Amino acid sequence: GHASIRSQASSRIFIGKVTENSNGYTLRKGEGESTLMEYKTNVGQYHACGVSKQSMGAVIWNVRWGDDSCFESHATQPRATLIDCCSGGFMHWRQGGDSAQMPNHMENLTIWNFYATNAQTDQDIDTEGKFTWWDGNGFWWKFMPPIIVGFHGSPLDFDDTQMKRLESNGTAVEPYSLYEAQLRKRLGYVPSWLSSLK
């Protein structure tokens, strides 16, 4: 398959407790059948759960996607997305988007306590092996500086000059879920519908 669940041109969407673990071929950068590599279990959709078009205020919560995938951020100006306590692959080039519709994501992409089961950089754009968010030499890889807190699992270094905030890289933080903590602060409790999804 090509894509999982996404918030497309919508506002205040919650996508939670989704598990996507399809089998298939791992991919390398390129076009056509030459990109297919090895057949494996739990590869996942090319684009995992995420956002597209003018999505605003989406929460992707407690989602598990495949090891050769990554969250979707399919351009045309999505903004203010929280990827909260999710796990799966963190692979370059899986976000998507037409070169005429860049950037992949505008302001306020927040990735909180992400557990990477597999991480990949791209030697063509990642200086010194550090994950790059804005490729100044290409057309397809453009993210405004994100906020990443508590990234852990497979190690990955990020280019500090392209980050709005980077904290606790390599170690999960408390609260484990930023979304739950915000609800608790605003409402005084975590709604039962959310607790039932744990």
Where is each model-derived feature located?
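Intrinsically disordered, low-complexity coil segments
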Residues: 25-44, 128-130, 137-140, 169-170
